[in-house]
Amino acid sequence: VLLSYQYESGNWPSSLPPGKDRLVQVCHGAPGVINSLLSIKDHFPKLQSRIDSAIRKGRECILERGLLTKESCLCHGISGNALALDDEHCQHFLSYTTGHEMKGLEKDGLVEKSDNPEGLWCGEAGRAWAWAIIDKGLPKRLLGYNDI
C-alpha cells in the first residue's frame, strides 16, 4: 500500500488522507519513506523491483527539493535527507552542513535556527551522527529508528 501513495514527483504525502505534495524531509515525505524501504526491501523479494523504482524516484525528488532551509538536522534538515541518498549525492548534501557552510547560510539568512539546537533529531547531535557514520563508512541509518 505504501508504494501506491507515492506522488508522480517521487515524494510521499506528509499525512493521510493525501493532500498537497509539499514536505521533503525525514519526518514527512520521501527521505523517511526511502530510509524505511531500504531497511525492509530484502524482506520483500517479490516487491524488489517496485521498491527499487520507488527509491529511485524518491531520490530524484530529494535531489530536486531536499536542500532545506531548516537547520541541518535529521528530522527536517539536510542531514536527514542526505542519509536517504546514494553515497555520491549524500556527500554533496553533507557539504552544505559543514560548520563553515552553516555559518555562511545563517549569516545570509538562508537557514532557520532550531528551537532545540542540542537535540538528536532536531539539532546538532543529529548532524554529528550523519557526519560520523559517513566518516566511518557505516550504513546510512537514522539513530533510534533503523540503526539496529
Task: Kindly give the residue locations of the regions a language model identified.
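Terminal, non-catalytic domain-edge segments
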Residues: 39, 43-45, 57, 61, ...
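Cytosolic regulatory protein-protein interaction regions
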Residues: 22-34
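Periodic glycine anchor positions in long extracellular repeat architectures
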Residues: 29-32, 77-80, 123-126
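Histidine- and/or cysteine-centered catalytic micro-motif in compact active-site loops
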Residues: 17, 36-39
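Glycine- and aromatic-rich loop/turn segments at beta-sheet edges
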Residues: 3-24, 59-76, 99-117
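C-terminal structural cap/anchor segments
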Residues: 48-88
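Broad hydrophobic/π-residue packing in well-ordered secondary structure
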Residues: 1, 11-14, 26-28, 41, ...
